Amino acid sequence: MVSYKDLGLVNTREMFAKAIKGGYAIPAFNFNNMEQLQAIIKAAAAEKSPVILQVSKGARNYANATLLRYMAQGAVEYAKELGWEKPQIVLHLDHGDSFELCKNCIDFGFSSVMIDGSALPFEKNIELTKKVVEYAHQFDVTVEGELGVLAGVEDEVAHEHHTYTDPEEVIEFAQKTGCDSLAISIGTSHGAYKFTPAQCTRDENGKLVPPPLAFNVLDAVMEKLPGFPIVLHGSSSVPQDEVDTINMFGGKLPDAIGIPEEQLRKAAKSAVCKINIDSDSRLAMTAAVRRVFAEKPAEFDPRKYLGPARDNMEKLYRHKIVNVLGSAGKAE
């Protein structure tokens, strides 16, 4: 058993309370490798923003649980080297699909876990989430539950259709499970194709314009659970400059589209205190790598293409922290 506190990590309880009160959201950035982690920590340290390092089941299998634990511990020390005296860093399991996986992550030093029982019948979701909460809270690990289903594909999570969260269920779910935060579905999606062209309109230049999020559902949830931490998954904006770069240098991402940043800014000022971003960093990384290979086809030193990828991701993360989520300066 490894305690996250011995690794220098924190859970989400205090940072979420501050975020709700302050009208901003904590960035939750997924990572799979060293370059992504370096970019996240450099951005968070530079902007003094609390940050959640997210690891999916697929990323955990890819990177190895033991290595991830030491990477997270190293991230805390790296942040201090960068001048962030008291880093507020969470190591979080994204979309845990079983009690066993959540337990194993807690035992390995994760400070927060998500148990995703959203595809289960309501009572079964409550039962599974409660079981994880009871184990996690013994070690002061925070737990995120989920109600409602997001469409899209990301790692090992795949659903064809949205199921919006039913506001009438949230009180019972929160009370019976004891979860610390709740992921809801209001129209966001996983992956780089969050909406089909048929779901969108087009502007005067022919660019796709995505439909608005269901803020009425969010408002109803907040009315039922005032002051309770809400989470949005699938919240990448799919920057069109990165998509254009990828396509310019041989990629094929036609009609890739995400959540407009103005809608995320609006959400961040509400009880939404955690916003998940994964696809955007993948796009930033891929765009930078493709550019290097196109401009320097003889290059084969990984540092020469992963370095620019890391820098491009850091730029993206800092933009999200400062201009979208409003979390800069909240972890001085």
Predicted regions and their residues:
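Extended, intrinsically disordered, low-complexity segments
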Residues: 288-332
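Short catalytic-loop micro-motif centered on adjacent basic/acidic residues
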Residues: 26-30, 91-92, 114, 230-232, ...
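Shared catalytic-loop signature of beta/alpha-barrel
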Residues: 60-64, 264, 273-291, 295-297, ...
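Short acidic/histidine-rich active-site segments
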Residues: 234-237, 257, 277-281
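A short N-terminal beta->alpha junction/helix N-cap motif
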Residues: 3, 24-32, 59-60, 304, ...
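Alpha/beta enzyme core
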Residues: 10-21, 34-59, 66-86, 95-229, ...
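Generic N-terminal amphipathic, Lys/Arg-enriched alpha-helix
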Residues: 1-27, 299-300
